Amino acid sequence: MNGYKDKVRQRKVSELEILRQILRDGLRIYIGSGCGEPQHLVRALLRLLPRHRDIEIVQNLSMGSLPQDWKPLEENARLKTLFVGPKSRDAVNDGLADYIPIYFSSIPRLFQEDPLWKFDIALVQVSPPDEHGFCSMGISVGMDKCAVESASVVFAQINREMPRTLGDSFIHSSRFHYTMEHDEPLPEIVFRERSAVAERIARYISPLIEDGSTIQTGVGRIPNWVMIYLEGKKDLGIHTEVLTDAHLHLINSGAVTGLKKTLNHGKIVATYCMGSRKLYDFVDNNPEVEFYPVEYVYNRKLIRQHYRMVAINSALEIDLSGQVCAESMGHKVYSGIGGYVDFMHAASSSPGGKTIIVLPSTTSDGRKSRIVSHLTDGAGVVSPRSTVGYVATEFGVAYLHGKTIRERALALINIAHPRFRDQLMNEAKSIHYVYEDQIAPPIYEPLYPGQWETSQVFPPNMPLFIRPIKPTDERALQEFFYTLPFEDIYFRFLSAMKAFPHRNVQAMVNIDYEHVMSVIAVTGEIGAEKIAGIARYILDQKTNMAEIDVAVGSGWQHKGIGTFLVHYVAEIAKDKGITGLVAYVLAANRAMLAVFHCLGYAVHSKLEEGIYEVWLRFDEPAMACRTEEYK
């Protein structure tokens, strides 16, 4: 036991002295990444770099002491980064540093097998060695462990502030050629202040994530905010890239148990950790949390084994066909690929898995739409259209998997910012993505009235989701009408309609939710919903009375669905200040007449040529029915 520690002590000398001995021109140096960057060693390296030429520095993500401005070191060293962050973004886009677009799952092979990637020196930070001589890579296992295993010379900063994380995070001290004990605080990432846009997106996403899901979240404010709205879930698992304070919040809520995970049962799995000291203390020597290198965490074959694997990642731009740009703004690199593609591909093939793209509808200044007809010139496609499942903005969720280009375009325009919807629709028409007569979604606010979404269980224990209709329901509504018996169609339209073409149905789904309101009862998940019933009113602005109609699918009748929908639409109409309801009902349609009579208001009616005109006012509670014209 003491032999290990003695061996380490023998190699402890001044960091400057060590670096002077091992540095020479033209070397390739790997530096530990993220909040695990060995800042003390980096500061010493920066003091010596002006004495050398053409040194190549490789790092994943800089959160520590590496400079933002590489101009003074232009002749001495050049940074190659595998992921672009705030500290390297300007240098990369000014041509003073290089960005390497790469799947993180392929990095171990690159480091170990490609002779052009052989590291001469690796500078890393570790926890103090245990009694057996093992040090933990702490909060930066990722590719640091892989670099240590392949570098010719390894120089480790031993920092007692570094958590001793468990999993496959350990390196024996004998692997280090030099060590330096230096304690200093680790960089901390403050959880950003609340964002109304991020919160709205998170609320939309929360229902998509089922109990027992295993979650991966990418870097960014919105993926982090999703965690806040998952507190009520049960038995969630975590298999992710970067563990943050948002994850800690979710863990402390009791929603995370990992008991449904296929792999690493009951364990939280990550490869990096970036957050507060509270988070670092949580992962320290915690058997609930396991850190693994990139070859494990990003392994698609392993990820896809998880039941209900959900990958939640942000985007900078998405075109109307579903191509996602997540690393650049045109030719300007903003971030990187990281594990984006690895997790998206794996989750899309996981049993019950889902891929969710989150993005604000506009740029931060509101001047540009992030949903576009075509990606900005120079933008890199990180996720192809074939792997995208759900897309969420603050205006709703679009489901793209298995959809045509036309259906994708309509779904994405429907969740774009209203200021850009007309423009997007016109551009979609010009490239023949949609019908030439396609109606654009509403362009004013308030938009989709999500407050009227609810759930209801009908006998014999059949849950249905009740919500206002959307433009993306066009095909589902067509299918619903075509399955109705002839008699029901006649009752609904008071005519023998045999066809429900696009030009007619699109007018039924593109509504303003004020003068026209349609509520549907659906079964199935977003994007695969089937309509069980529909109720609609159309407001007569002269009388302030709303004409109502209702239809229920043949397989869903006699369960109270029609009655519920009429009651619900009546509640909405009353809430909007409408005076009352009116309906035109065939005398033979006794069911609809009965529904009207159980709404709790006085029902008035008159019969002409076999059709009842039935009406009620919300200011007249149920009393004796009268047959007279409404005023």
What are these regions (language model features)?
Residues 1-440:
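Conserved alpha/beta enzyme-core scaffold
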Residues 447-631:
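Long, contiguous binding/interaction regions
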Residues 434-449, 462:
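Intrinsic disorder at enzyme termini
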Residues 337, 414, 442, 484-487, ...:
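Generic detection of intrinsically disordered/low-complexity segments and helix-coil linkers/edges
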Residues 269-272, 445, 501-502:
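Amphipathic alpha-helical surface "interface" segments used
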